[in-house]
Amino acid sequence: INAAYPLFDDTIEQRAFDPAKAAEHYKASGHDGSPIMLAAAPGAFPGAVDAANLFAASANAAGIPLQVKLEPDDGYWSNVWNVAPFCASYWGGRPVQDQMYSTAYVSTAEWNDTRFKNAKFDELLLAARGELDAAKRKAQYSEMAHILRDEGGLILPMFNDFVSGVSDGIAGWIEDPNGELMNGRAQVKCWLA
């Protein structure tokens, strides 16, 4: 969830790169030191294999034995994503935060690829759907975002960067967090003013 969403909490601090802290958490995990495999394929998203290798280098610098397993594009979304315990993935935007959270993070979601399960998160999501007080609803989404950041298993190196250049001579334009050119709808929703 990023600033394209109206209920985004811009006070959530970005995590800093801290190999010493990562090493501390890894040692405390009790992991046996065997290689941790990160599955990636070029088709996961543009630059997925490079991103996985950069992440592995950062993890290795902290003493975490992460290795990248290159998977074929063919069958990646059927045989690797949401099957392998640790793999590269790509999420495009959704029209509203509720849909993103419901699709990927609520405990019962079929596409919950991090296997995140948190009863408080689920309760907040359900409550926020029916909350009419805008400030309270924003606070509920903020609490959900904090829970995800602190307890979720997602490693998020970047957000999609949709750069929109629009002339003053174009009418009907609205920002859309789902994709470039109003999620592909600019040609049917906009006109020359």
Language-model-detected regions and their locations in the chain:
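Detector for C-terminal structural segments
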Residues: 1-7, 23, 44-56, 74-193
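Short, well-ordered beta-strand elements
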Residues: 33-43, 66-69
